[in-house]
């Protein structure tokens, strides 16, 4: 591949432990094939909060709150080789991690 090209990988997950495990797998795979790696860079965590009434029709003051957190990481692979791309394509990551790749 060209030397000035880079691969940007964005990872999203609800579980931060699963996300960190996946990022370490990607970084180790890229380093084994001779590419330079920048990251993982933690991006801001999105927190979605939902407030619902506890009772079906009375007690407006009684409410329950739920939240879900979306953790994100960014990895830049600088100067990737063809072997790097092949090994990243074969990499099997967890089902709870969303991977977005940009060239």
From Swiss-Prot:
> Which GO terms of the cellular component aspect does the record hold?
ribonucleoprotein complex; ribosome
The keyword Ribosomal protein is assigned to this record: yes
In terms of domain of life, where is this protein from? Bacteria
Q: Show the stretches that span the lipid bilayer.
A: none
Q: Which residues form a coiled coil?
A: none
Recorded GO molecular functions are: structural constituent of ribosome; tRNA binding
Any idea which UniProt keywords this protein has? Ribonucleoprotein, Ribosomal protein
Q: Tell me, what's a Pfam family for it? A: Ribosomal_S10
What is one Gene Ontology biological process annotated in the Swiss-Prot or TrEMBL record?
Answer: translation
Query: What is the annotated role of this protein in its UniProt record?
Result: Involved in the binding of tRNA to the ribosomes.
The family database entries (PANTHER family) matched by this protein are listed as: 30S RIBOSOMAL PROTEIN S10 FAMILY MEMBER (PTHR11700)
User: Which family does the record claim for this protein?
Assistant: Belongs to the universal ribosomal protein uS10 family.
| Self-association and partners | Part of the 30S ribosomal subunit.
**The protein, known as:** Small ribosomal subunit protein uS10
Q: What is the scientific name of the source organism?
A: Syntrophobacter fumaroxidans (strain DSM 10017 / MPOB)
């Amino acid at each position: 591949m060209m030397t000035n090209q880079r691969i940007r990988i964005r990872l999203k997950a609800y579980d931060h432990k699963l996300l960190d495990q996946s990022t370490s797998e990607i970084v180790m795979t890229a380093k084994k094939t001779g590419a330079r790696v920048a990251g993982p860079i933690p991006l801001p965590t999105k927190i979605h909060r939902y407030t619902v009434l506890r009772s079906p029709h009375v007690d407006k003051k009684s409410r329950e709150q739920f939240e879900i957190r979306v953790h994100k990481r960014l990895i830049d692979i600088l100067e990737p080789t063809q072997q790097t791309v092949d090994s990243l394509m074969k990499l099997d990551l967890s089902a709870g991690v969303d991977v977005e790749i940009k060239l």
